[in-house]
Structure formats: structure tokens, C-alpha cells
Amino acid sequence: MHVPDHDTLLTEGVIAKFLRYVQIDSPSDEDSTHAPSTTDQWEIARLLEGELLALGLRDARVDAHAIVTATLPGNVPDAPTVGLLAHFDTFPGTPGRGVKPLIHQGYPGDTIALPSGATLSTVSHPELVHCLGHDIITSDGTTLLGADDKAGVAEIMETLCRLLRDPGLKHGPVRVAFTPDEEIGKGVDHFDVPTFGAVAAYTFDGGAQGEVEAENFNATNLRVTLTGRSAHTGYAKGAMVNALHLAGELMSAIPSTMRPETTQDFEGFLHVDEIAGNVESVTLKMLLRDFTEAGLAHKRAMLEGILTGLQQRHPGCQAKLEVTGGYRNMKVEVDRDPRVMGLALKAVRDAGVAPVQRPIRGGTDGARLSFLGLPTPNLFTGGVNHHSRTEWASVQWMEKAVEVGVRLVQLWAGERLATTAAPRKDTGSFPIASA
């Protein structure tokens, strides 16, 4: 894709950037063993590198794993370096190729009808109540929009542009990073925290206006393999052990009050995310989530108990449990430096927005970065209903996110450079193991 010139980038605004980015296909692929997981992601990575170079950020580069980094030098001596991060991959579980963005100007409060036949209303999307008169961006309803997280990418790029346009805005060094594969939990697998060199960072990867998030799930991703015994269906009595039925028993044993569709706020869950197999063998991909490590351990013990019961009730059944990944709650790391959240909350207030602190019922690149010694809470982008064909974003909320970004780096410019702890080896992830 053509790289806009310096003057265009400085003047076009955040929405022009966003519309350009969402029309570049960049879904990730959880089954891939490559980094990045899809070749599509290289196009937007190289475009962003080109745009950063066009803006005059001379150290802009995309590395061998499609991580894009650059530095905006500071104009205040001895100010600490702050980082701004977003990811450019999109969720692979919803169609994300060929996005056709639409702008619905001056939302009047009624139902928004998309060309696909899908609709958005204040009933199905209560956040729209706060967006009367706003310009709302959607896809045509056949794909997701990609506000998660190309809204964050566009907002960080526009933050840089505003700082460049107005030399009177005082700031220290600003490091930016755009990462691939966040949606599959691999966004910072190859991220070099010491080289990045920031004392704190912020992911722009949140939702509705005002959200400031410094607490996320503890997470374990699991692969459960149930092995049965196949037999001729006409002579199966006493011989067949149907792995499909075993999987049904497993799913039925998960308490109905402990599922994603029945939990909220600080409640954790067990979730069957994917299932495949036949009579002889079934594989289930499962997600365990809780805000405390004790709660997560309890859920794992519960699942292990269910599997033990299956094997006892069905001689010939075998159950294997493997941990395939996970992450931990970053709150303990973010809280080590009160400035990290304190300045974020002040930046939101200074932009005329009331901060909304709530737990992230998911994970971000920031969760793992925090355990590597780079405290990284999450800020709103103005995008809502992520991972859906009815994903949408408010233009006005996106513009507020840019205001917050600009104000945030100004506030950090007033801080004194301090010695920071050495980066940790703890990745915040659970090791691959089997049970």
C-alpha cells in the first residue's frame, strides 16, 4: 500500500488513518507456528514502518517478527521514556478479510441497519446511549471492523502527529510499538523490553470512552484429549466407548454458573472454545479464567476431577490434559509504581472524561510486558463489541483517546528520570506442561 507523505500524515486526522488500516487484511492464526502467524500482517507492518519514517522518526524499523518500533525524541531534558503500544492483527474467529468500513454520521439514537442485515441498537449495544450525535463507524456486517486494535494503532499514530505539529507540547522520549499476533496470545513473544527502554508503557486496546484498566484475568489455555474405543456399531455393546459422548458429559459437568455467558465483573469461568473429533478421539480447546491465582487453581482442580470421574465411569476411556498457554494478572506489577496509573487517570480527567476503572475480562500484551519489568496498563480506544460483525467505534471517542495520549506524554515529561528495576525473566505466562 502507498505510504502517505509527511504533510498528509500530519493533517489527515485519526479517522483517515483508521479507515486506511482496517482495509488491510491482517488476521492472526492460532494454529500457525510462524511469527508472525500470517503473511498478511507484513503489509500493515511495513506500511506503519513507512509512515513512521515519513514522519521523521529515523529509527523506525520492522523486525524479523513484524514488530514495528520507533522513537519520537523528547524536547524536555531528563524526562523518562514512556511507551505507547497497540496491535495490528485482528481476531481470527470472525471473518476479517475485505473489511468495508461505513461511517454513520450524527447517530440519532435509533437502530443502525448494516447492508448484511445485521443491526445495532441501544438495546443490543447499550454503549450507544452515550453516543447520541456521534459519528459511528461499522463494517458492512459481513466482517468484523478491526477497531480491535487498529483504532489503537491510528490513535497512537495521530498522537505522534499532534506532538510533531506543535513543538510547544512538552514531552520526553516517546517509544511506540505495533505488534502482531496479540489475538492469539503471542504479541510480545519476541518483544525486547530492554531495547524498548521505557519506564512505563500503555496499550491502547480498550473499549468505551474512559476505560482505564490495570487488572486482567489469570488465564490458562488447555487442550483436553479424550480417547475412547471404536467398534462396529452393529456389535458395539460392551465394546464401544464413544469419545463424543464423553465430551458431552464433560461439558455438561461444567456448572452453568461458571460459564462466560453467565459471569461478569470479577467472576471467572471455564469455557469450551473448540471441539473436534470422532468416536475414537475428541480434542477440546478450553479456557480457564479467574482474577486470583487461587481461583484459577480451583477451576483446574475441578476440571481434573471431572476427567477423573469420566475415566472411572467409563473403563477404556483415557483423558489427557495439556497446558498450551496463559497469562497472569498484571495488577501487582503495575502497582509497583503509583505514577503509572496515577498519570493515566489524570490524563483521562484532563481530557474532560471521567475514568472508568474495571477489570479486563481478557488479556493484553501489557499483561506479559508488566511481568517483564515494563508496567503496561490499558487505555480506551473508543471501539466496542470487539470480535463481532457488529463491532463499532465512535469517531468522537477515538478523538478523545488521542487527547488522552497527548496529555499522558505531557504529564510524564514532568516526572524525574529515576532508576528502574532490571527487566524480569518472568514472562507472566504459564509454562507448557501436561497433566
Predicted regions: what is each one?
Residues P4-I136:
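Acidic/His- and Gly-rich active-site-bordering loop/insert found
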Residues P4, T138-A147, S230-K237, S388, ...:
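A short glycine/serine-rich beta->alpha loop
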Residues L128-T143, T227-A231, A351-G352, G383-H387:
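Glycine/charged-rich beta-loop-alpha catalytic/anionic-binding loops adjacent to active sites
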Residues V129-F217, S256-D273, G277, L284-F291, ...:
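Acidic/histidine-rich catalytic neighborhood of metal-dependent amide-processing enzymes
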Residues P115-D135, E213-L226, K346, P377:
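Acidic-glycine-rich active-site phosphate/pyrophosphate-binding loop
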Residues T90, T143, S230-A231, L288-L296:
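A generic structural motif
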Residues A201-A236, M240-L246:
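Phosphate/diphosphate-binding glycine-rich loops and adjacent basic-rich segments that engage nucleotide
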Residues H2, L244-A435:
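Metal-dependent amide/peptide-bond hydrolase catalytic core
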